[in-house]
Regions:
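Pyridoxal 5′-phosphate
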Residues: 1-174
Length: 174
């Protein structure tokens, strides 16, 4: 029986060339990159080389690149960094259909005194961009909306959302 995998929003296999490049780190170069010994230092150098390559591709500085271990950590780092950089702003916008990790972070932020706006979706899973526009305020620190819903597969109009958010001078995370 042949299988068709339709849940690539949740997890995706790595490209063969990525797998090949990672084999040494699964078999020989598995030291702790933070260790002071040579074994760890070799891994640390590989991570720094990767950071520099990513920075070059993005037109950024290597010290601006942060590697995380998973999507949950990535989302939390992005949102928390935005809030720490703008302590005077206490409002966050996201959707009711975000990944559970972001919903949990939102609940945590509400307990810490932040105000969250959770945008709804229609019966087809689409966002109302007028609702987003109305929700943005002077104290909005960040808008965090996933590119595509991991349960329904609905793709959100990220380019349009990014333009709307940028016009208002608000940080955007997707």
């Amino acid at each position: 029986m042949s299988v068709i995998y339709l849940d690539n929003n949740a997890t995706t296999s790595v490209a063969p060339e990525v797998f090949e490049s990672m084999i040494p780190f699964f078999t020989e170069k598995y030291g702790n990159a933070s260790s002071m010994h040579t074994f760890g230092g070799q891994v640390g150098k590989s991570i720094q080389d990767a950071r520099e390559k990513v920075a070059t591709m993005l037109g950024a500085q290597p010290e601006e690149i942060v590697f995380t271990s998973c999507g949950t950590e990535s989302d939390s780092t992005a949102v928390m960094s935005a809030l720490q950089a703008q302590p005077e702003k206490k409002h966050v916008i996201t959707t009711r259909v975000e990944h559970s990790a972001l919903i949990a972070l939102g609940q945590h932020l509400e307990q810490k005194g932040y105000e969250l706006t959770y945008l709804g979706v229609d019966s087809k899973g689409r966002l109302d961009l007028d609702e987003l526009s109305d929700a943005m305020r002077k104290d909005t620190a960040i808008v965090s909306i996933m590119f595509a819903n991991n349960e329904t597969g609905t793709v959100f109009p990220i380019q349009k959302i990014a333009e709307m958010v940028k016009e208002r001078g608000i940080l955007f995370h997707t």
